[in-house]
């Protein structure tokens, strides 16, 4: 039979094998084809490293299966593993080792079975099938080992044939783990399994607890039939595309396949079948789409149009829509803006009530048309109840209803017994005997429903004095509840308590399970000193808001206070201090924000924009970003999509390498711009740096290192500050922002180091408007360097600058001393208008 072997570079090799071949035989065939010695090959299948002495059939590897080939880098490295008892274990590993391999090494040393081990790094639980390099674990990193207490829980998996399988799992198991357990029991490859719970298809990377799957829950197993079927997609130009699909594929999957074939981003695709627009989350079988069915592809034109919606109060809302949007879509947009549930909205145009399933173009609604919004009034009022799985329930209630009554209504709708319900509003747990009006719950308020897990557990709270308190809690308890229990035991008011777990401050409205706090976990209690402080928040409209805060408040807490005062949702807020965007998880003291400091509030406009990232393999990734995102944020989004660690990414735009701390708008990157992604190759090379005294320094570098990085390495070795270093190669002065590969500097190349004498000089640059700029320069600076300094001061790109001195236009590669430009000389700056000069 044939199998495929995929390398990390994306290359796929085809091998002729037999099911009885050993892994050793397969590696020999790879050596014959690719020249890679077997001892440098590691083969992975279904997230598991394959052992030499086993056969393909031992691993249920069938025809057209794909193995993954990872190369062992010679040499390896040491890492440390710290247990909860404080013991530290040293392991010899390679960056390409999987977490599973690491657990096996721990078992060899400590005798702990892998299925009882949980490894934590940088606060994240590590998954068996991933490698150390996937998590950027480097030499001498420390992992933390937490033991899984035996027991977990049992769940059931029911197949379409009616057979029920029992599995031993833990709430923290991923769906991928569950599929692997099903494979172990039933031999069904994970890629042929679809798991359904509460009517929802479960995603591989999520955990059982993400879906609120509890002990003795039943999942449904649907098999993906191999081979699937063909369908056709017809475009408006008449072109027909053939796709290989399965009836269980979602519309989202189909759009991704169309993107692979045609390069059309999914958000620009609308698929129509039997006159109906298909929704992303539904499957082909939901729409009864069978083999050789034809779908119609309509492109969403970017930009669409604006329409207005006028309410009975006279308020006018502006919406971005497309003529192909359904009335249902429009109501959803109104809900996003105004919070009015679609079932309370009636839309009127030209005296006619609009029906949900029709489109704007069906009613001839064009740009800048005005719709009228009429609310359906109910008796009493409506409130919403949001569950942990994200489902929202609508209830008809009255302000005088007790919490007990509300729980009974939830039982009627959802079948959840009242004694398993906990209702939370404004971060507070609601008591049965109180009424909605006691808690100031008004129409369209949203309550949060948390289920009580039967049984509870004990946790410990350690104070700074060393005292340890034991608390009886449930995983669904909020941090606020925990603080109340501490107050009951110790008399410390909740507003003076700060609880820390895994180095993170815990927020009142979150639950213990949100932070993965399990039985016998230890929290740390730190007391807040009374008093706090005031800070100011200035908006773009010039309004200043005063907030009462503490230095230990997180940015997330501050945004919540702004929401309380101004009604602006936190996800639309960006806070700036000292020119820096503040991150949610950090505290005010992390940024040295003191009393009476002023923060600046910038609103994120909903929707942001799309940009494209093109890799060297030609693959194009689509990202949702905002102009205010930093390059660091963008690299994190690429990591989320592609798994490439940020420190291996170099992003290029307009020929320039982008710096982590700058934003997209700093580089004038706009919607639908394309960035280029270049990978930093690990391993690097040696170069030499020769000083004027004749001394030669050896440096370990990578071709992707910037000149700035190289100067930092020289500073580490020789103590010379980067701003006093000038590096020369092939007679050319090297610029900080460029890379070694930009200058074709290869292994064992020699750079020359010239020192800048301190002091330099000042020159003046006069613009046509009469403005004079002062620059700090040196006689050895090139004209290119000078233009870069002008860009830093004035924001004018170098390619739009022409510099004149003594009636002569200055050339980029020459230095100031070449033109005899001395201290306090005046240059003249003329701007090049695109397409010609002025």
Curated annotation (Swiss-Prot):
One of its GO terms (biological process) is ubiquitin-dependent protein catabolic process. Coiled coil: none annotated. Residues 837-838 form a propeptide. There is a cross-link at residue 48 (Glycyl lysine isopeptide (Lys-Gly) (interchain with G-Cter in ubiquitin)). The keyword Ubl conjugation applies. The keyword Ubl conjugation applies. Residues 1-76, 77-152, 153-228, 229-304, 305-380, 381-456, 457-532, 533-608, 609-684, 685-760, 761-836 form the Ubiquitin-like domain. InterPro entries: Ubiquitin-like_dom (IPR000626), Ubiquitin-like_domsf (IPR029071), Ubiquitin_CS (IPR019954), Ubiquitin_dom (IPR019956), Ubiquitin_ubiquitin-like (IPR050158). GO terms for molecular function: protein tag activity; ubiquitin protein ligase binding. It holds the Pfam family ubiquitin. Keywords: Cytoplasm, Isopeptide bond, Nucleus, Repeat, Ubl conjugation. There is a cross-link at residue 76 (Glycyl lysine isopeptide (Gly-Lys) (interchain with K-? in acceptor proteins)). One of its GO terms (cellular component) is cytoplasm. In C.elegans ubiquitin is encoded by 2 different genes. ubq-2 gene codes for a single copy of ubiquitin fused to the ribosomal proteins eL40. ubq-1 gene codes for a polyubiquitin precursor with exact head to tail repeats. Ubiquitin exists either covalently attached to another protein, or free (unanchored). When covalently bound, it is conjugated to target proteins via an isopeptide bond either as a monomer (monoubiquitin), a polymer linked via different Lys residues of the ubiquitin (polyubiquitin chains) or a linear polymer linked via the initiator Met of the ubiquitin (linear polyubiquitin chains). Polyubiquitin chains, when attached to a target protein, have different functions depending on the Lys residue of the ubiquitin that is linked: Lys-48-linked is involved in protein degradation via the proteasome. Belongs to the ubiquitin family. This is Polyubiquitin-A. The lineage of its organism: Eukaryota, Metazoa, Ecdysozoa, Nematoda, Chromadorea. The gene is ubq-1.
């Amino acid at each position: 039979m044939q199998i495929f072997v995929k390398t990390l570079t994306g290359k796929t090799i085809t091998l002729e094998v037999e099911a009885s071949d050993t892994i050793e035989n397969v590696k020999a065939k790879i050596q014959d084809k690719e020249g890679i010695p077997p001892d440098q090959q590691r083969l992975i299948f279904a997230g598991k490293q394959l052992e030499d002495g086993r056969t393909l059939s031992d691993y249920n590897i069938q025809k057209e299966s794909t193995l993954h080939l990872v190369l062992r880098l010679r040499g390896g490295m040491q890492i440390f593993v710290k247990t909860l008892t404080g013991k530290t274990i040293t392991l010899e590993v390679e960056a390409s080792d999987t977490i599973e391999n690491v657990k096996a090494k721990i078992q060899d040393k400590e005798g702990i079975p892998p299925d009882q081990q949980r490894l934590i790094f940088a606060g994240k639980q590590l998954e068996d099938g991933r490698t150390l390099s996937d998590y950027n674990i480097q030499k001498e990193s420390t992992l933390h080992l937490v033991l899984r207490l035996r027991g977990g829980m049992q769940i059931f998996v029911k197949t379409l044939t009616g057979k029920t399988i029992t599995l031993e799992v833990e709430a923290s198991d991923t769906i991928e783990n569950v599929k692997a357990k099903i494979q172990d029991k039933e031999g069904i490859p994970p890629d042929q399994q679809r798991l359904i719970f509460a009517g929802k298809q479960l995603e591989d990377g999520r955990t059982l607890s993400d879906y609120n799957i509890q002990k003795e829950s039943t999942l449904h197993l649907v098999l993906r039939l191999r081979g699937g079927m063909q369908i056709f997609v017809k475009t408006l130009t008449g072109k027909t595309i053939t796709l290989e699909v399965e009836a269980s594929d979602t519309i989202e999957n189909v759009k991704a396949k169309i993107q692979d074939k045609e390069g059309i981003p999914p958000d620009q695709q609308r698929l129509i079948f039997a006159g109906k627009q298909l929704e992303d989350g539904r499957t082909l079988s939901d729409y009864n789409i069978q083999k050789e069915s034809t779908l119609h592809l309509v492109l969403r034109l970017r930009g669409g149009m604006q329409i207005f919606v006028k309410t009975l109060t006279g308020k006018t809302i502006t919406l971005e829509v497309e003529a192909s949007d359904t009335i249902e879509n429009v109501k959803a947009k109104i809900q996003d803006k105004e919070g009015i549930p679609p079932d309370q909205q009636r839309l009127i145009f030209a005296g006619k009530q609009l029906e949900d399933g029709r489109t704007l173009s069906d009613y001839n609604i064009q740009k800048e048309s005005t719709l009228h919004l009429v609310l359906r009034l109910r008796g009493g009022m409506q409130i919403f109840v949001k569950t942990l799985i994200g489902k929202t329930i609508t209830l008809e209630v009255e302000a005088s209803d007790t919490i007990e009554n509300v729980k009974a209504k939830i039982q009627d709708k959802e079948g959840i017994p009242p004694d398993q319900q906990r209702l939370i509003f404004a971060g507070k747990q609601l008591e049965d005997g109180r009424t909605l009006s006691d808690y100031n719950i008004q129409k369209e308020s949203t309550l949060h429903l948390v289920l009580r897990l039967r049984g509870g557990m004990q946790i410990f709270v350690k104070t700074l004095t060393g005292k340890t308190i034991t608390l009886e809690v449930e995983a669904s308890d909020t941090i606020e509840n925990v603080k109340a229990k501490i107050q009951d035991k110790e008399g410390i008011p909740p507003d003076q308590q700060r609880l820390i777990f895994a180095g993170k401050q815990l927020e009142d409205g979150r639950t213990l399970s949100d932070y993965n706090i399990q039985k016998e976990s230890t929290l740390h209690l730190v007391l807040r000193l009374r008093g706090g402080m005031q800070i100011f928040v200035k908006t773009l409209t010039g309004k200043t808001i005063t907030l009462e805060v503490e230095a230990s408040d997180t940015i997330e807490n501050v945004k919540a206070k702004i929401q309380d005062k101004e009604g602006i949702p936190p996800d639309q807020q960006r806070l700036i201090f000292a020119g820096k965007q503040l991150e949610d998880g950090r505290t005010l003291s992390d940024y040295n924000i003191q009393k009476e400091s002023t923060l600046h509030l910038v609103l994120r406009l909903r929707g942001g924009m799309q940009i494209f990232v093109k890799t060297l393999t030609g693959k194009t990734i689509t990202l949702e970003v905002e102009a205010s995102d930093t390059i660091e944020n963008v690299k994190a989004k690429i990591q989320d999509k592609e798994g490439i660690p940020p420190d291996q990414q170099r992003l290029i735009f307009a020929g320039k390498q982008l710096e982590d701390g700058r934003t997209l708008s700093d580089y004038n990157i706009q919607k639908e711009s394309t960035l280029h992604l270049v990978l930093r190759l690990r391993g690097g090379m040696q170069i030499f740096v020769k000083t004027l005294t004749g001394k030669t320094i050896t440096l370990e570098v990578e071709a992707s290192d910037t000149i700035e990085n190289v100067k930092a390495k020289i500073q580490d070795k020789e103590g010379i500050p980067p701003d006093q270093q000038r590096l020369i190669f092939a007679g050319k002065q090297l610029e900080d922002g460029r890379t070694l590969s930009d200058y074709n500097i290869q292994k064992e190349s020699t750079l020359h180091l010239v020192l800048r004498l301190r002091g330099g000089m000042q020159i003046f640059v006069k613009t046509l408007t009469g403005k004079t700029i002062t620059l700090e320069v040196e006689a050895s600076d090139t004209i290119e360097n000078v233009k870069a300094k002008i860009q830093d001061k004035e924001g004018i790109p170098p390619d739009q600058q022409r510099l004149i001195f003594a009636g002569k236009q200055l050339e980029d590669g020459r230095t100031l001393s070449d033109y005899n430009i001395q201290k306090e000389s005046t240059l003249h700056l003329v701007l090049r208008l695109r397409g010609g000069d002025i």
